[in-house]
């Protein structure tokens, strides 16, 4: 009986830890999402009209992705379909390709940051649900053991 009471106590502690960690993950994930969004919005980038979501402010993952895609299209059009690596070292269009590549990499980094922050929020929700389930099971087992 004492061993069961100890395991129920441990289950309760673990469930509370899971729920606290879950809440922290949700807060941190949401904060990161908001920070990335605010940083992008502060750049005043507007998606090119000829892109998906044209005319929208880049402050979220979808507009950032659309802008990165159209930058690739414009860079390739400007360089005659050649990438940075394919252009001669002395070709003045190499700078265009390089700038396009850097801009795309920056936008894709923000898209990844949005994705990771949403993943952290989702995992936080999962931690809370597992904690609640564990707490519920520990309570039921304790009630059954006491009967």
Region annotations inferred by a language model:
Residues 2-15, 113-147:
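Juxtamembrane interface at the cytosolic side of transmembrane helices
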Residues 34-110:
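Extracytoplasmic/periplasmic regions of membrane proteins
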